[in-house]
Amino acid sequence: MARLPLQVLAVSLAVLAWPASCQRLPVLAPVTKDPATRLYTIPFHYGANVVVDSAGPLVWTTCAPDHLPAAFPCKSATCRLANKYHAPSCSESAADKLCDRSHKVCRAFPYNPVTGACAAGDLIHTRFVANTTNGINPVSQVNVRAVAACAPSKLLESLPQGASGVAGLAGSDLALPAQVASEQKVPNKFLLCLPRGLSADPGVAVFGGGPLHFMAQPERDYTKELAYTPLVSKKGNPAHYISIKSIAVANARVPVPSQALATGGAVLCTRSPFTLLRSDVYRPFVDAFAKALVKQGAQGGPVARAVKPVAPFELCYDTKSLANTRIGYLVPGVTLTVGSGKNWTMDGLSSMVEVKQGTACLAFVQMQGVKAGDGSAPAVLIGGFQMENTVLEFDMKKKRLGFARLPFFTQCSQFNFTRTG
């Protein structure tokens, strides 16, 4: 009988330890860059890949003709969430068309982030088949229940070959991160580390937060090195916005018009291959870069030789006239000072893109169809190329963006996707 208290104590300790030992792990997905479109995809289920769209509010895929719609009534909370954000091309497909009258179930309006096309589609139940992770390796397979919208195959136009839909990663309740968080009981945040260039090895996305380790320095957790800035809410837009206080080239502030950066803000957008700048920001930025590069040559650096521009870029150079280093071409650095006062610095690897043999261009593009100072458009749209080899943490609960540039000896493609025993 004397042993009974010890047995009770042992059971009590086991019960107290249970939550820690059964803590739900984040969900892992490899991120592949498509060489033809420069878009990024993740596997979704059973060989089907979907494009990751950091500004997309929904998950959508093509469906079999005989698919069964989910029984979401037209006035249900899920139906309202699925139709909370409409793309401009869907503006006429509003409340009067939310119902499939033949089945009296909810319809949503999936949107192609490249062409801008949209179409009506049933909401369905699906599964995101992936692996949990400890931040070092995959741990075990998991099937995450999710709600998605069906889309006709014509909506796949201009997406990567083999893609069957889009996974929206925006700050909406039916975007993939929020659905994973709800089903897996993990934080509503995700890590994104896009692979550099056209590497065959994938980058990594982790839904639910860190840690995050890479093989080059396996003891180093890059989520501990993040600088943070607030995420800014935009009415009627679930995309991830931040504010930018200033832009500098070679540590000299670019003389953009007063309030230009504050008007419209900045948005992170994987659907754009390169960073877009509104004209009132683009012109002074490009001029500042060109002058800084000339000054660099006059001060003893390599003299860059301009060549005929290659669309959509304006400043292009002969690569033989640019010194190549471990951090890319030796060109003036570009620094974004974000709302928190932290600096997001871009070296030659992030500012210059080789467009053909012997030619590299400044990888920033003027935004089209938008007037200078138009607050309905962002001043800066940070594209996928400039996000590559950078650990990004989108934290929807704390409403902040974390960012950390990887050192030259580490790549987003160096996550160890070998499952642990």
Regions flagged by a language model, labelled:
Residues D66-C90, A181-Q184, N188, P218-L226, ...:
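Cytochrome P450 catalytic domain signature, combining two hallmark sequence patches
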Residues P202, V206-G264, C361:
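Flexible, small-/acidic-enriched active-site or ligand-binding loops
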Residues P113-Y222, A227, L336, G341-P407:
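Glycine-rich flap/beta-hairpin and adjacent strands of clan AA aspartyl proteases
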